[in-house]
Amino acid sequence: MQTKYEELEQLRSKYPDFSPFVLLKLSMIRYGARLTDAALDRVQDPYYSFGAVEPFGIDFVGRTEKRAMPGPILLRDSSNVYINYGENYSDPYDVDWDEDAGVFFLKEGDRIIETVDFVPRPAFFGKKTSRGTPMEALADVRAQLLILTAFQRCRFWEKGDQCAFCAFFTSGHTMGEVDCQDIYEMIHEAIKEPGRFSEIHVSGGTDFTGEPPFELEAERYIRVLQAIGRNFKGRFSSQLMCPAYPKHLLKRIYEQTGITSYCPNIEVADEALFRKLCPGKEKWVGYREWIRRTVDAVEIFGKGNVYTQVVTGAELAEPDGFRSMDE
């Protein structure tokens, strides 16, 4: 059986013009990574410790409230890899701390694959808003990116229409709709750290309430984006990650806030699998309408400012997905 290292070497040989760090990142996302006891001890240091609060409301079986988790893993090319620490991976890499060398190593068994580090703890973590809300409960951090959750629930779960691969807001510890004053104060504090953040993303669970559907959700995003905007003059580097809205809602959001880009995540590229794996999105928008609205959004946000994302691996979902990588 081929090892992860052998697989990486084969890919690097096959694709010599492809960044070896991107290949490593893809491999780490595929296989996952586990913190050794030595690494977990080391990341309790305040420089690394992100704490135990999970702003997307997910309970990972391998985590404990008594032990803080680090942020994303940093590679030597300055890119970062987000890992769900505590997930039950079947064949993960190990991240180990070498006391003698004073560095973290990514390992497969005893073989050292790469020298790695972790994104440092943001300066605003550990602080509270004037309402007493922990600031780290309001945003997740990816190196220089802040990701805010405007609505820490997803209404697709109410009737079993949630996306099949999603675990967001399932821990029971989330706060529902966030407070706009909390958001303003958290952003105000976060941007005090020189050069730390370059972009703000706003996301959250889906709320189809309103007539037409998503009307109230759009109004919520407007309030949150306006609260963020109080910290800036004019538009600010940002992205709204939400359902595919009709043009009239998107136009309101764009005109009333400082948002600069839009990302309605289709999640699954295949139409039949989309219907099966994303029943809520199919019910309230539909696959083809999702694509049409995404394309239409370019008229509002401009070329190069509209995105989407897919969930890697969904195309292999049984029984309707591809049966092999070759297929």
Placement of each model-derived feature along the sequence:
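Flexible, acidic/Gly-rich N-terminal and inter-domain linker regions that tether
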Residues: M1-C154
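Alpha-helix initiation/capping motif
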Residues: S49, D179, P246-K247, D270, ...
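Conserved Radical SAM active-site core
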Residues: V95, V119-T260, V268-A272
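Alpha-helix N-cap and loop-to-helix initiation/capping positions
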Residues: V178, D182, P213-R220, K281-E289, ...
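Active-site-proximal beta-alpha loop/turn segments in soluble metabolic enzymes
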Residues: S203-P212, A272-P279, Q309-P319
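Conserved strand-turn element in the central/C-terminal portion of the radical SAM core barrel
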Residues: R235-Y245, P279-K283, T294-D326
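Catalytic core of soluble alpha/beta enzymes
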Residues: I259, C263-L277, K281-I291
